[in-house]
Amino acid sequence: MTTGFLQKIFGSRNQRLVKQYQKTVAAINALETQIETLTDDQLRGKTGEFRQRIAAGESLDKLLPEAFAVCREASRRVLKMRHFDVQMIGGMVLHYGKIAEMRTGEGKTLVATLAAYLNALAGRGVHVVTVNDYLAQRDAEWMGRLYNFLGLSVGINLSGMEHDQKQAAYAADITYGTNNEFGFDYLRDNMVYETDSRVQRPLNFAVVDEVDSILIDEARTPLIISGQAEDHTELYVRMNALPPLLERQIGEEKADGTGVEKPGDYTLDEKGRQVFLTESGHEKAERMLAEWGLIGDGESLYAPQNITLMHHVYAALRAHTLFHRDQHYVVQNDEVIIVDEFTGRLMPGRRWSDGLHQAVEAKEHVKIQSENQTLASITFQNYFRMYAKLSGMTGTADTEAYEFNEIYGLETVVIPTNRPPKRIDKQDQIYKTAKERYDAVIRDIRECHERGQPVLVGTTSIENSELLSHLLKQAGLPHEVLNAKQHAREAAIVAEAGRPKRITIATNMAGRGTDIVLGGNVEKQAAFIEADESIPADEKARRIQQLHDEWETLHEQVKTAGGLHIIGTERHESRRIDNQLRGRAGRQGDPGSSRFYLSLEDPLLRIFAGDRVRAIMDRLKMPEGEAIEAGIVTRSIESAQRKVEARNFDIRKQLLEYDDVSNDQRKVIYQQRNELLEAHDIAETIGAMRHGVISEVVRQFVPAGSIEEQWDLPELEETLRNDWQLDLAIQEMVNESSSINADEILDAVTTAADEHYEAKVALVGRESFSAFERSIMLQTLDRLWREHLAALDHLRQGIHLRGYAQKNPKQEYKREAFELFAAMLDAVKQEVTRIVMNVQIQSPEQLEEAAEQIEEQGGQLGNVEFQHADFAAAAAAATAGGAVVADATAEMVGHAMSHSGPAGEVPRVGRNDPCPCGSGKKYKHCHGKLN
């Protein structure tokens, strides 16, 4: 109450910021007359002048009014578009490292040019990040004319580009590209073996378009570069026969034995999207697997030798019960392609992790691709936080403002519209059944069609969009369907969605990034005419003028009919996605309207609010086909959405806390790699490692401060001779000197190791040997880092079970991950020292051969894939401790079974200690063994 009273007097934080920025806009407008008098060359020359002033110490903030005025004037001349005052405010918000929320149609693409131009003047690079290649290419070509006019270079970073093209794109002043490609390039840069092979510069400033989609919807899933691992194709095919033999149990058994309506083999929790085998399900699964010869008669699925089978059972079960064709994925060209749950777009190349994708492939009887081993991974949360300055734009950020601030430290500023919005958002209508809902939708569409009003219908899945398309065909209503299957025609369909009587069905936010202009997008049609070389120039001009005249008539016709009408056929889990759909109408002060039609059979209502709404309908004795249209129901639905959003935020926050652990380790490894790549000579590093390793070897047999009776000299001599190529008569040395102590023995062995090393260097020369050492160090570091990532995955998937032992899973994960990391660094030292001490060379040519041989033996993985992984696996770890219910609890259970046990405490690994990888072998026979 006090807050509201103070806001009335002083205004909200948002209002105060906008008012502050408006003063700067006034200063920019005051410069406009002066800037307009400049010739094109003088205007272009301002860029060089600004750069000199920056070099002399002037700040970007001080340059802002003049730079924005120059950018606006250049845009007016080149693009025939003058930035509105509100767009100037948007540009300032981006420059100051905040998020600008701007309504659809307010010109976000043009706003980005202001902040990009100003920050590019510093010469450290600006990345403009979009959600797909089409938008990156469109914006780079469209806005590139403006930047080129002002003397700045523009690069486009697309997937599949050649290495030198990427280097050129990143060297440009402003680089357009997709979030995935920027992230993958960062990972690839940290896998190279030569400094010249890197493409990125240090991450300076990023403007993220559709920031909510990239930093929130996509943040939960990591980017993964992977290579093929062991092949279990046959096992997936065998396991695929199991789920159809199992029956679902209806109801959960309570403590008193009641609650089960229909006994079965597995339970399904739709709210948490979990699946669990019941006791009878376990017995039936074990019986079937024994019949198929996959386990022995009477054996348990939990027996150590059957651990991996449990993982495959759950993968198959999840594939059959939780993942549905044309909703979660489509099958095209003998391939399972994931459908993005937020945008409805197809995501070719992206695969679910941990065997789920293979299980779905087996279910659909398409070719099963091999499982992969992770080579490198990073989440968008951690990638984008590495930029020195980060900003973003979207039409819907305010509902997630808390998360942006909490995770990324980004403040959200709502930018006023250039013209007052005229869209009318009508009350939701709720029906008892989906059939009644669709009947009402068809009625509404028919009414709009008859009065010439264009309609955009939003659905939540491909399946629903095709069902609605079928109903419209039956009703004789012509329409266009825009879902993942029509991806190639997306821009063309959206461009025409504002024409009179046009009916367009869109899956979620497919087509985002292209404006729906009332009367149709005349610029798109004009571009097609311009591109047609067979039409003479004067004929082109005549046709384009005719198009503009026709558009004026159509535009007025649609405005009179009420503008674009938005129909939502289902509420999404997130209010933000609903707002994005609504936001397609009423652009730039145009009229428009929106309404959501819901049914009690919708997942959101059924899971969160169905019983309450059904009770209201029963109490009111609602006849069939009659809808509830009440504020209390809409508020109830929004409350359910807030619960889901809060749950998803908790998942993302917990995921980040887990990922921060591996992120800190990733930074250490990548920093060490970069130092190795840039160092001219790493002899000092190799020497320090050698001394540490030799000291550890000697101390195993001759402990510090011990007496002669405690020494095991024969074993020490044998170990040095077999493992380190050092032939020393230590027993003889001790016999000859009665006063020798443990430290002197260590000194003698260290000196011998140094001499052995120097003799190798002398044979081939310091420069050649240094290159060999660098190569071996990088290969060993990369291989052990890969194995470490796999170990962290296993640790994370089973860590939630520590909660049952009254331990904090998060703290346990941090502790054990650190111990694994320390063991990995020790293993790197051991292995590099072992290779350098054992390599037999006589010439530089032999040295190159040895390096190649070690690389082959190191198991370089082929068929490298770049994936933006599925949320399911990531959420599994985030929900550790049971604080939050996630999409993939079944996956957690499956992997808890497949994990061979918690990582042991290994502060330092001795030769005879168990190997920290969990194989059960001694370290010297496992990761301590020379390949």
From Swiss-Prot:
Q: Which GO terms describe its cellular component?
A: cell envelope Sec protein transport complex; cytosol; plasma membrane
Q: How does it sit in the membrane?
A: Peripheral membrane protein
Keywords noted in UniProt: ATP-binding, Cell inner membrane, Cell membrane, Cytoplasm, Membrane, Metal-binding, Nucleotide-binding, Protein transport, Translocase, Translocation, Transport, Zinc
Q: Which cofactor does it need?
A: Zn(2+)
Q: Name one GO biological process term.
A: protein targeting
Protein's job: Part of the Sec protein translocase complex. Interacts with the SecYEG preprotein conducting channel. Has a central role in coupling the hydrolysis of ATP to the transfer of proteins into and across the cell membrane, serving both as a receptor for the preprotein-SecB complex and as an ATP-driven molecular motor driving the stepwise translocation of polypeptide chains across the membrane.
Q: What is this protein called?
A: Protein translocase subunit SecA
The organism of origin for this protein: Burkholderia mallei (strain ATCC 23344)
